[in-house]
Amino acid sequence: MPRLLAPLLALSLLLLASGAQASYITRTLNKPVPGGVAVVDLGPATSAPSARFDGKPVLVVKEQDNWLAIVGIPLTQKPGTAVLNQDGRTLPFSVGSKKYPEQRITLKNTRQVNPNPADLKRIDRELAEQIKAYRSFSPALPSNLILDKPVNGPLSSKFGVRRFFNGEERNP
């Protein structure tokens, strides 16, 4: 038994040391699944590198001596290897799978599930405004990467739930 103790202790210390090397941002935000966030280490540099995922710019922040790319992963992303492009080089990262909890809602007003043509016209107009906002990108650092709870009070439902309205899945 004492002969097993030394290798077990060495392995434990190695595992602790490897976990300690991950940055606070990585430990807190890195949940690389569809609908999650990947934190990709870009390494050290004198100025902020530029990074893109799926042709779109991503937030780059500095923590200690390294730059990190904060990559939002679409819900439609297939599990497997994804690629971040950073100043001419490609950085692969793994996207895991995730089974989201489901919520099934039955609505009496079917227009809220399958809108009529007038509703669709308004929805399309509002969607165009949303897409315009989504396409804008500011390299300015946000005041807080770790989001705070928006309000105190009872939680009506968790974020990250697949919703079905009258049996039909809808985007959140």
Language model feature labels by segment:
Residues 1-6:
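Positively charged n-region of N-terminal signal peptides that target proteins for export
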Residues 7-16:
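Bacterial N-terminal signal peptides
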Residues 22-92, 97:
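Cationic-aromatic interfacial patches
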Residues 26, 92-172:
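Surface-exposed, glycine-biased beta-strand/turn segments
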